[in-house]
Amino acid sequence: HDALPICSSDLRPLGIPCIEDRLIQQCIKQVLEPICEAKFHAHNYGFRPNRSTHHAISRMTFLANRAHLHYVVDIDIKGFFDNVNHGKLLKQMWSLGIQDKSLLTIISKMLKAEIEGIGIPQKGTPQGGILSPLLSNIVLNELDWWISNQWETFEPRHKYTSYNKFSALKSSKLKQMYIVRYADDFKLMCRDYETAQKALIAVKNWLKERLDLDISPEKSKVINIRKNYSNFLGFKLKVIKKGRKKVIKSNINDKATKKVISVILERIKELKKSPTVKTVNRYNASILGCHNYYRYATYVNIDFSKIAFLVSNNLYNSTKRIRGKTGSKSKAYINYYGNYNIKTVYIAGIALFPIAGIKTKNVMNFSQNICDFTKEGRELIHDKLKGINQNILQYIMENPIQGETTEYNDNRVSLYVGQKGKCSVTGEPLLISNMDCHHKISRELGGKDEYANLTFVICDIHKLIHAITKETIQNYMNKTQKFINESSLIKINKLRKLVGNCELYIS
């Protein structure tokens, strides 16, 4: 154990377990997680399988756009991870059904592991351990359900249809509120200011009385998102008028923007100091990582355009002696940035990813039926594999091509799934007896066994791609006549050109 400095100049316990401890913690987690997952609230998105920050943002967006809840209660718990009550946590685990006393003793000792230079902690969960995120969710699970039972999951005495239940609740004195939580960062969505203010006071008192946790008065407040932004997980959200509707507008928040700029400037400094393939790849990885996380902001293009402008002078001045006009574009560059009309900068012969090359992507709600621990839930996780012949997939996995590289055989499996078991030219289902894995650029011309250079086609199409003589071409044109149309012919000609053959025409 050690202590980690945090922004407020305090020290936070950082517990990074050794390999033996990590194995034990992982074993405990694998036993506890299925039990806890069944009891956790649906809209707790932090540190849970298949859920992410983007699902939390999506839920908040949904409540603002569709339910028209425009008053947000921002609550900031003071040093949550440092102030978890150990005794209360163990009691919460017991009430969840985790009643093995030996296991609870092990967890208790883990929580009280000595921190070098500080001693034995009396409260808090050390960050850095495998089990700590799950324990933090157990602590706040009680809060999730307490808030949810005020309205969302409230059970009336009479049985109602879904619509009639909502009408009955509206006519009662219950306060409409919904919780969206990611770890210790959570929002309450309410319909009016009065309800939001009451919710803030109620949650403040509940946290103190039940969990012995304090909230920060300066950071905890009610926000009308029609007038002001609410910050959540690196985004800032506000409701704006769009036509006759009011919809969420989201940007990268100010703190996250400064962090992105800081990371980019650090990568530029590395490029200037050492313009190598390694530092270029590190720079590109940082840009792509930022784009992937923040692309769900509706105004992400404007935000990154501003960031690109702010770092442009630094990038130009630091790289003007090391940049080139020509080089190669990676597969990732072509996939993510190939359609952008932005001047390409090359360093060490590799294209730098453009900072402003980003478009917004619609954020999707989490499907509550997805679960690692039920048969139905696992089927939804692997939904993309539906329609793929599992017998053929199994055959490809169990029968690698002898004499070929491991990369080639591994990519055949990925390729079959990626093409959904269909020929890339005709769209016909691939069969074990009628499928060939074609190198787009042949090995003789320098082609490799990488995924991007391979494609599955039916056998006759493969022979047509490589056919040279008129007789052979005509023979396979006749055989594949029912598959050949304008679209498939364009694909065949592209593949023929890559192997150095002439284009074909339908007479």
Predicted regions and their residues:
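Extended C-terminal regions of large enzymes
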Residues: 310, 317-403
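Short, contiguous acidic/charged loop-to-helix segments that flank catalytic cores in large enzymes
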Residues: 398-414, 441-450
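Short cysteine-rich loop/turn motifs with clustered Cys
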Residues: 1, 402-436, 458-460
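Short, solvent-exposed helix-loop connector elements
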Residues: 13, 122-125, 249, 265-279, ...
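Histidine-centered nuclease catalytic patch
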Residues: 427-459, 467-476
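Non-catalytic, peripheral interaction segments enriched in hydrophobic/basic residues
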Residues: 275, 279-338
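Conserved polymerase palm-domain catalytic core
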Residues: 1-5, 39-51, 55-217, 222-225, ...
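A conserved non-catalytic segment of reverse transcriptases
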Residues: 112, 117, 210-275, 281, ...
